[in-house]
Amino acid sequence: MRAILRFAILALACFLVAVGGGCEQAATPEPKLGDFANPQRVTILGYNDHAMEPFVSRDGKYLFFNNSNEAVDTNLHWAERIDDLTFQYKGEIGGVNTAALEGVASMDRNGVFYFVSTRSYDETSSTIYRGSFDNGTITGIELAPGVSTATPGIVNFDAEISPDGNTLYFVESQFGSSGPQNANILIATWNGSAFVRDSNSATIMKQVNTSKNLEYAPAISSSGLELFFTRLVESSPVLYVATRTDASSPFGAPRKITAATGFVEGPTLSPGEKSLYYHKREGSLFVIYRVTRP
Protein backbone atom coordinates (compact mmCIF):
# COMPACT_ATOMS: atom_id res chain seq x y z
CA MET A 1 0.00 0.00 0.00
CA ARG A 2 2.94 2.32 0.55
CA ALA A 3 3.41 2.24 -3.22
CA ILE A 4 0.43 4.55 -3.69
CA LEU A 5 1.73 7.37 -1.56
CA ARG A 6 3.13 10.58 -2.85
CA PHE A 7 6.74 9.50 -3.21
CA ALA A 8 5.69 6.63 -5.46
CA ILE A 9 3.40 8.83 -7.50
CA LEU A 10 6.19 11.30 -8.15
CA ALA A 11 8.75 8.60 -8.86
CA LEU A 12 6.46 7.05 -11.44
CA ALA A 13 5.64 10.41 -12.98
CA CYS A 14 9.33 11.21 -13.34
CA PHE A 15 9.87 7.82 -14.99
CA LEU A 16 7.12 8.61 -17.48
CA VAL A 17 8.90 11.85 -18.32
CA ALA A 18 12.09 9.92 -19.00
CA VAL A 19 10.37 7.63 -21.49
CA GLY A 20 8.51 10.40 -23.27
CA GLY A 21 5.11 10.37 -21.60
CA GLY A 22 5.67 12.96 -18.93
CA CYS A 23 3.98 16.02 -17.58
CA GLU A 24 3.02 19.02 -19.63
CA GLN A 25 4.48 22.46 -18.95
CA ALA A 26 1.70 24.88 -18.02
CA ALA A 27 1.95 28.58 -18.84
CA THR A 28 2.20 30.85 -15.80
CA PRO A 29 2.21 34.63 -15.30
CA GLU A 30 5.45 36.46 -14.51
CA PRO A 31 6.38 37.11 -10.85
CA LYS A 32 4.86 40.20 -9.25
CA LEU A 33 6.22 42.80 -6.84
CA GLY A 34 5.64 41.50 -3.31
CA ASP A 35 6.10 37.85 -4.21
CA PHE A 36 8.00 35.57 -1.85
CA ALA A 37 11.80 35.87 -1.71
CA ASN A 38 14.84 35.18 0.49
CA PRO A 39 14.86 31.37 0.90
CA GLN A 40 16.33 30.26 4.24
CA ARG A 41 16.79 26.82 5.76
CA VAL A 42 14.89 25.98 8.95
CA THR A 43 16.73 24.36 11.87
CA ILE A 44 15.06 21.69 14.00
CA LEU A 45 17.25 21.40 17.08
CA GLY A 46 17.75 17.81 18.21
CA TYR A 47 16.65 16.30 14.89
CA ASN A 48 18.87 15.38 11.92
CA ASP A 49 16.75 13.05 9.78
CA HIS A 50 14.49 13.86 6.81
CA ALA A 51 11.85 16.52 7.47
CA MET A 52 8.99 16.69 4.98
CA GLU A 53 5.40 17.93 4.63
CA PRO A 54 5.75 20.82 7.11
CA PHE A 55 2.73 22.41 8.74
CA VAL A 56 2.86 25.33 11.19
CA SER A 57 0.02 25.38 13.73
CA ARG A 58 -2.41 28.28 13.42
CA ASP A 59 -1.09 29.87 16.62
CA GLY A 60 2.49 29.53 15.38
CA LYS A 61 3.64 27.47 18.37
CA TYR A 62 4.33 24.15 16.67
CA LEU A 63 5.84 22.67 13.55
CA PHE A 64 4.43 19.32 12.44
CA PHE A 65 6.24 17.21 9.86
CA ASN A 66 6.96 13.65 8.84
CA ASN A 67 10.18 11.86 8.11
CA SER A 68 10.97 10.62 4.61
CA ASN A 69 8.01 9.49 2.52
CA GLU A 70 10.25 6.69 1.31
CA ALA A 71 10.94 5.34 4.80
CA VAL A 72 9.71 1.86 5.69
CA ASP A 73 7.80 3.43 8.58
CA THR A 74 6.94 7.07 7.89
CA ASN A 75 5.75 8.79 11.09
CA LEU A 76 4.50 12.17 12.27
CA HIS A 77 6.75 14.36 14.42
CA TRP A 78 6.46 17.74 16.13
CA ALA A 79 8.68 20.61 17.23
CA GLU A 80 8.14 23.78 19.25
CA ARG A 81 8.88 27.25 17.89
CA ILE A 82 11.89 29.19 19.14
CA ASP A 83 11.84 31.70 16.30
CA ASP A 84 10.71 31.73 12.67
CA LEU A 85 13.72 29.70 11.55
CA THR A 86 14.38 27.58 14.64
CA PHE A 87 12.28 24.88 16.30
CA GLN A 88 13.03 22.53 19.18
CA TYR A 89 12.32 18.89 18.38
CA LYS A 90 9.81 17.28 20.76
CA GLY A 91 9.62 13.77 19.30
CA GLU A 92 7.06 11.67 17.50
CA ILE A 93 3.46 12.74 17.96
CA GLY A 94 1.80 10.45 20.46
CA GLY A 95 -1.20 8.26 19.75
CA VAL A 96 -1.03 8.50 15.97
CA ASN A 97 1.85 6.53 14.46
CA THR A 98 1.48 2.90 13.41
CA ALA A 99 3.48 0.40 11.36
CA ALA A 100 1.74 1.87 8.30
CA LEU A 101 2.52 5.28 6.83
CA GLU A 102 1.42 8.46 8.63
CA GLY A 103 2.13 11.91 7.21
CA VAL A 104 0.81 15.21 5.81
CA ALA A 105 -0.33 16.93 9.00
CA SER A 106 -2.65 19.94 9.23
CA MET A 107 -4.75 21.39 12.04
CA ASP A 108 -7.48 23.97 12.49
CA ARG A 109 -7.61 26.67 15.18
CA ASN A 110 -9.55 24.38 17.51
CA GLY A 111 -6.92 21.66 17.56
CA VAL A 112 -8.68 19.26 15.20
CA PHE A 113 -5.76 17.47 13.57
CA TYR A 114 -5.83 15.91 10.09
CA PHE A 115 -3.36 13.48 8.58
CA VAL A 116 -2.96 10.82 5.89
CA SER A 117 -2.47 7.17 6.80
CA THR A 118 -2.53 3.91 4.87
CA ARG A 119 -3.46 1.92 7.99
CA SER A 120 -6.88 0.82 6.75
CA TYR A 121 -6.73 1.35 2.99
CA ASP A 122 -6.99 -2.35 2.17
CA GLU A 123 -10.29 -2.50 4.09
CA THR A 124 -11.72 1.00 3.64
CA SER A 125 -10.07 2.47 0.51
CA SER A 126 -9.72 5.61 2.65
CA THR A 127 -6.68 7.51 3.90
CA ILE A 128 -7.64 10.86 5.49
CA TYR A 129 -7.99 10.80 9.29
CA ARG A 130 -8.76 13.33 12.00
CA GLY A 131 -8.38 13.56 15.77
CA SER A 132 -7.78 16.03 18.60
CA PHE A 133 -4.28 17.36 19.28
CA ASP A 134 -3.21 18.33 22.79
CA ASN A 135 0.31 18.66 24.15
CA GLY A 136 1.92 16.38 21.61
CA THR A 137 -0.71 13.63 21.54
CA ILE A 138 -3.68 12.92 19.28
CA THR A 139 -6.83 11.27 20.61
CA GLY A 140 -10.20 10.29 19.15
CA ILE A 141 -8.75 9.29 15.79
CA GLU A 142 -11.30 8.50 13.07
CA LEU A 143 -11.58 8.57 9.30
CA ALA A 144 -12.64 12.06 8.23
CA PRO A 145 -16.31 11.36 7.43
CA GLY A 146 -17.61 12.10 3.97
CA VAL A 147 -14.28 12.70 2.22
CA SER A 148 -13.44 9.37 0.62
CA THR A 149 -15.49 7.69 -2.09
CA ALA A 150 -14.24 4.37 -0.62
CA THR A 151 -13.41 3.19 -4.12
CA PRO A 152 -10.45 0.84 -4.61
CA GLY A 153 -7.86 2.47 -6.84
CA ILE A 154 -8.82 6.01 -5.83
CA VAL A 155 -6.37 7.53 -3.37
CA ASN A 156 -6.54 10.75 -1.33
CA PHE A 157 -2.86 11.32 -0.56
CA ASP A 158 -2.85 14.98 0.55
CA ALA A 159 -5.10 17.32 2.51
CA GLU A 160 -5.13 20.59 4.42
CA ILE A 161 -7.92 21.85 6.64
CA SER A 162 -8.80 25.55 6.58
CA PRO A 163 -8.03 27.56 9.74
CA ASP A 164 -11.71 27.67 10.74
CA GLY A 165 -12.10 23.91 10.22
CA ASN A 166 -14.95 24.30 7.76
CA THR A 167 -13.24 23.49 4.47
CA LEU A 168 -10.96 20.62 3.53
CA TYR A 169 -8.73 20.94 0.48
CA PHE A 170 -7.65 17.46 -0.52
CA VAL A 171 -6.06 15.54 -3.38
CA GLU A 172 -7.66 12.71 -5.27
CA SER A 173 -5.81 10.40 -7.63
CA GLN A 174 -7.13 7.66 -9.87
CA PHE A 175 -4.80 4.68 -10.20
CA GLY A 176 -4.66 2.21 -13.06
CA SER A 177 -2.46 -0.75 -13.86
CA SER A 178 0.39 1.57 -14.87
CA GLY A 179 0.07 3.91 -11.86
CA PRO A 180 -1.60 7.29 -11.26
CA GLN A 181 -3.74 8.61 -14.08
CA ASN A 182 -4.15 12.05 -12.48
CA ALA A 183 -3.93 13.98 -9.22
CA ASN A 184 -6.26 16.92 -8.64
CA ILE A 185 -7.18 19.20 -5.75
CA LEU A 186 -10.81 19.05 -4.59
CA ILE A 187 -12.86 20.76 -1.89
CA ALA A 188 -15.20 19.49 0.82
CA THR A 189 -17.13 21.49 3.42
CA TRP A 190 -18.05 20.51 6.98
CA ASN A 191 -21.79 20.35 7.69
CA GLY A 192 -21.52 19.74 11.43
CA SER A 193 -21.23 15.97 11.31
CA ALA A 194 -19.43 15.12 8.05
CA PHE A 195 -17.73 16.60 5.02
CA VAL A 196 -19.69 17.14 1.83
CA ARG A 197 -17.84 17.36 -1.45
CA ASP A 198 -18.28 20.73 -3.15
CA SER A 199 -20.11 20.17 -6.43
CA ASN A 200 -18.35 23.28 -7.78
CA SER A 201 -14.83 21.93 -7.15
CA ALA A 202 -14.11 21.43 -10.84
CA THR A 203 -15.14 25.00 -11.65
CA ILE A 204 -13.30 26.54 -8.70
CA MET A 205 -10.13 24.58 -9.50
CA LYS A 206 -10.36 24.78 -13.29
CA GLN A 207 -7.15 26.80 -13.66
CA VAL A 208 -5.36 24.92 -10.87
CA ASN A 209 -5.89 21.33 -11.96
CA THR A 210 -4.51 20.15 -15.28
CA SER A 211 -5.06 17.03 -17.34
CA LYS A 212 -1.41 15.98 -17.75
CA ASN A 213 0.30 17.33 -14.63
CA LEU A 214 -0.14 16.21 -11.04
CA GLU A 215 -1.42 18.88 -8.62
CA TYR A 216 -1.09 18.17 -4.90
CA ALA A 217 -0.07 19.47 -1.44
CA PRO A 218 -2.69 22.26 -1.11
CA ALA A 219 -2.36 25.04 1.47
CA ILE A 220 -5.07 27.66 1.91
CA SER A 221 -4.87 31.17 3.37
CA SER A 222 -7.17 32.18 6.23
CA SER A 223 -9.22 34.35 3.84
CA GLY A 224 -9.60 31.50 1.37
CA LEU A 225 -8.30 33.82 -1.36
CA GLU A 226 -4.85 32.26 -1.84
CA LEU A 227 -4.20 28.62 -2.63
CA PHE A 228 -0.63 27.34 -2.57
CA PHE A 229 0.13 23.95 -4.05
CA THR A 230 2.71 21.78 -5.80
CA ARG A 231 2.56 20.88 -9.47
CA LEU A 232 4.76 18.25 -11.07
CA VAL A 233 6.09 20.03 -14.16
CA GLU A 234 8.12 17.88 -16.53
CA SER A 235 10.39 15.99 -14.11
CA SER A 236 10.38 18.41 -11.15
CA PRO A 237 7.84 19.55 -8.56
CA VAL A 238 7.27 23.32 -8.50
CA LEU A 239 5.44 25.51 -5.96
CA TYR A 240 2.57 27.67 -7.21
CA VAL A 241 0.01 30.11 -5.85
CA ALA A 242 -3.43 30.85 -7.29
CA THR A 243 -5.62 33.73 -6.09
CA ARG A 244 -9.23 34.83 -6.33
CA THR A 245 -11.25 37.91 -5.39
CA ASP A 246 -13.76 36.22 -3.09
CA ALA A 247 -14.07 32.88 -1.35
CA SER A 248 -16.76 31.52 -3.68
CA SER A 249 -15.10 32.41 -6.99
CA PRO A 250 -12.81 30.22 -9.10
CA PHE A 251 -9.07 30.61 -8.61
CA GLY A 252 -7.17 32.45 -11.32
CA ALA A 253 -4.13 31.34 -13.29
CA PRO A 254 -1.42 30.08 -10.90
CA ARG A 255 1.97 31.79 -10.56
CA LYS A 256 5.23 30.10 -9.70
CA ILE A 257 6.85 30.77 -6.34
CA THR A 258 10.11 31.53 -8.11
CA ALA A 259 12.16 31.93 -4.92
CA ALA A 260 11.62 28.26 -4.04
CA THR A 261 14.09 26.53 -6.33
CA GLY A 262 15.21 22.93 -6.73
CA PHE A 263 13.19 19.87 -5.76
CA VAL A 264 10.54 21.53 -3.57
CA GLU A 265 7.11 20.43 -2.33
CA GLY A 266 4.52 20.84 0.39
CA PRO A 267 3.97 24.60 0.97
CA THR A 268 2.36 25.83 4.19
CA LEU A 269 1.73 29.36 5.46
CA SER A 270 2.77 30.91 8.75
CA PRO A 271 -0.06 32.33 10.90
CA GLY A 272 0.69 35.88 9.73
CA GLU A 273 0.94 34.59 6.15
CA LYS A 274 4.18 36.48 5.51
CA SER A 275 6.21 33.26 5.51
CA LEU A 276 5.80 30.17 3.37
CA TYR A 277 7.42 26.94 4.58
CA TYR A 278 8.10 23.92 2.37
CA HIS A 279 10.46 20.98 2.10
CA LYS A 280 13.44 20.83 -0.22
CA ARG A 281 15.86 18.12 -1.21
CA GLU A 282 19.48 18.96 -0.42
CA GLY A 283 21.73 16.16 -1.61
CA SER A 284 20.22 13.00 -0.16
CA LEU A 285 18.34 14.78 2.65
CA PHE A 286 14.95 16.51 2.72
CA VAL A 287 14.94 19.65 4.86
CA ILE A 288 12.52 22.49 5.55
CA TYR A 289 12.93 25.95 4.04
CA ARG A 290 11.14 29.26 4.35
CA VAL A 291 10.56 32.17 1.96
CA THR A 292 9.06 35.51 3.00
CA ARG A 293 7.08 38.40 1.56
CA PRO A 294 6.57 42.00 2.71
Residue ranges and their predicted role:
Residues 1-9:
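Bacterial N-terminal signal peptides that target proteins for export
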